[in-house]
Amino acid sequence: MAVEFFRADHERLQNHEDCLDLLRRMDAAMDQDQVAGETTFAMALVTTEEIIVASVGDSGIWLIPATGNWINLTVHQQRKPMIGSGDAKPAALRYPRFEGTLLLATDGLLKYTSADRIVETCRGQPANTAAQSLTELVKYPSGNYPDDVTLILMPL
């Protein structure tokens, strides 16, 4: 339900207040739905001048520059309550746009491997290759994963 809600309304997003409003309305709608559960949600609005992130839950958004330290853009988000609880507390922040790679990922990646391995994997290879390599970092020898792994890599 969260994805459908986002798809129906994403074109009107212009600033961090719009992003917060979307997540609040999504939370209220999912809370009223008898079938919908709770979910984490992380989104990034990238313009020519800035990156706006809005999130709730344990997914994260990182900026990985070509060199130097990575930046956790969702460091101030609330882990719980999640979207669909009716009590979610979304956080939205604005950052100047940097050169590098933007990573949006679930905790299935962020929790089960080190930041150093993630950053090293993202640097020096095309985004599609890096994305496949990132999923391999957390795969068990059996081929299973410890948790769901969803990620988006966006070169900036």
Label each PLM-derived region with a short phrase.
Residues 1-156:
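PP2C/PPM-type serine/threonine phosphatase catalytic domain
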